[in-house]
């Protein structure tokens, strides 16, 4: 099971996570408290030696996000907006992989949404809760465990949505391709907590002791 920690905004957090997790996500999104300006993004990405950096955005036009990633040597763009076939082709031309996002909405067909995205060229497909959703399910997860279980084994699917060290065992039991955590390992927005990171990795079976 792979692990991505998202919303990394400080050099010391890059140092903490590099090589410990598989993906490090950097958010370029003005509305996010974890957002990193493009200039600082380049400085942070240069510190990554072992993990795979990801540019995460919703409001940047897909081609612009791909261009920014390519210019900084970031191999993956996780885009929370709508992606057309042309965006996937353009990313491929620029040597950047896309990670599209399927959003859980009560009553909608999550499996169909994930299946459609998996049919496109992808680094992984992220399953996440709606932004700002206050719904809480088992253990504080933002997506029902049953819904996660239905998509966990469909392919390169990453599960997100309220995952913390305390509930990570519920998600780990589904044996997904990857889990994606941001606020669940923070002491404050954009500040990763080393103790919480290690507790998460222990809950996911990635660290012993």
From Swiss-Prot:
Reactions mediated catalytically: N-(5-phospho-beta-D-ribosyl)anthranilate = 1-(2-carboxyphenylamino)-1-deoxy-D-ribulose 5-phosphate
CDD domains found in the cross-reference section: PRAI
Superkingdom of this protein's organism: Archaea
Listed GO MF terms: phosphoribosylanthranilate isomerase activity
Membrane-spanning segments: none
Record carries keyword Isomerase: yes
Protein name according to UniProt: N-(5'-phosphoribosyl)anthranilate isomerase
Gene: trpF
